[in-house]
Amino acid sequence: MPNNSSDSSSILHCSFCGKSQNEARKLIAGPSVFICDECVDLCMEIIREDKSDQLEKKRGGVPTPMEIKSTLDDYVIGQDNAKRTLAVAVYNHYKRLESNDTSADVEISKSNVLMIGPTGSGKTLLAQTLARLLDVPFTITDATTLTEAGYVGEDVENIILRLLQAADNDVEKAQRGIVFIDEIDKISRKSDNPSITRDVSGEGVQQALLKIIEGTVASVPPQGGRKHPQQEYLQVDTTNILVICGGAFNGLEKVIEKRSSKHHGIGFGATVRKNSKEESVNVLLKELEPEDLLAFGLIPEFVGRLPVVATLEELSKEALVRILTEPKNALVKQYQKLLEMENVKLTFTDGALEALAQRAIERKTGARGLRALLESTLLDIMFEIPSKQGVREVVINREVVEKQIEPLLIYAEEALEANA
């Protein structure tokens, strides 16, 4: 006679719902406990809902365009038109994500952004400030390192991997992040003529970026690098990821001028325009049309997926002086804080600030070059001050910047008496 009691005792059960191994599709073993696949799914759903609730509470609503611009004003000087354009685009994008309206009669597409402006005009800083304001994952990618799949270089999927890493590998959080692709103008089509060699870092990369910009489920290798058949992939939906592309687009103003000059005619009835040398790049960029980007080398599908275009102006000397002193993280304030830790006051005269701005313009580095100029100007001071006794104030004037002479050091009275 068979022993049924021993057979029943060998059947394993889920420690949570009590289902036997025969009733469950999968039973996962732990230290003296078991859990079935249905309980795992239920636990995942509870965690997912909890995360979603926490995210909603943390977000507390999307800032209005005016609030977004006000925050950008605290960190970025000038560029009002670009700020307004970005504020509206970002507001509409995240408002679209927050909307619970799932009706199929109106589908709002995402507003990816193309920022065009010279080096050091604030493109990267604007994107970074937006991500910090919205408290979303953010990553910066250099488009020049990207190549088509199968060629030496970075795969496009690595952009999503970096965003995932910025989100602490939280897929849902990454799917609401911001990607900034810099130097996008460097992947313009090299030539209109067909060639026997493949353009793997130009048009090929534009084609590869299309799906990520528009929205797709990307298969991302969790450890990065190239894809392997045996590797497990993370599935990331890029539909709700805001993509901001930026580039200097040097020479684009010539394309705009060439296109616009065709509409003015020739002869006695022609409209008289100023000489192109007298027209600033800023004015020409305001006349930008999609056909100009096509002529520059971007493919039609790529231009069509970047509906919002924000143009940034070349920074004037006055704007660069304001950048040195006004933002919350202004460079002058940072160096003043560093010397304040040594109980020394750092003072810049108006002439010194103007000289720094003028040198940045001459180097064509914009605001990005200001830090390097300040570093070289203050190097000796930062080296010597910790060892000098009794220094109360350091004054930087125009001659210190232009001629690299010693700055004026003001000592405390008691230090002067001791030296006497």
UniProtKB/Swiss-Prot annotation:
Keywords: ATP-binding, Chaperone, Metal-binding, Nucleotide-binding, Zinc
Keyword ATP-binding set for record: yes
Binding site for Zn(2+): 14, 17, 36, 39
Coiled coil, from the record: none
GO terms under cellular component: HslUV protease complex
SMART domains to which the protein is assigned, alphabetical: AAA, ClpB_D2-small, zf-C4_ClpX
Domain ClpX-type ZB: 2-55
SUPFAM superfamilies: Glucocorticoid receptor-like (DNA-binding domain) (SSF57716), P-loop containing nucleoside triphosphate hydrolases (SSF52540)
Sequence positions that bind ATP: 118-125
InterPro entries xrefs: AAA+_ATPase, ATP-dep_Clp_protease_ClpX, ATPase_AAA_core, Clp_ATPase_C, Clp_protease_ATP-bd_su_ClpX, ClpX_bact, P-loop_NTPase, Znf_CppX_C4
GO function term, MF aspect, one: zinc ion binding
Short name of one Pfam family: zf-C4_ClpX
Oligomer status and interactors: Component of the ClpX-ClpP complex. Forms a hexameric ring that, in the presence of ATP, binds to fourteen ClpP subunits assembled into a disk-like structure with a central cavity, resembling the structure of eukaryotic proteasomes.
Protein family per UniProt: Belongs to the ClpX chaperone family.
Function comment: ATP-dependent specificity component of the Clp protease. It directs the protease to specific substrates. Can perform chaperone functions in the absence of ClpP.
Protein name: ATP-dependent Clp protease ATP-binding subunit ClpX
Organism from which the protein derives: Magnetococcus marinus (strain ATCC BAA-1437 / JCM 17883 / MC-1)
Taxonomy of the source species: Bacteria, Pseudomonadati, Pseudomonadota, Alphaproteobacteria, Magnetococcales
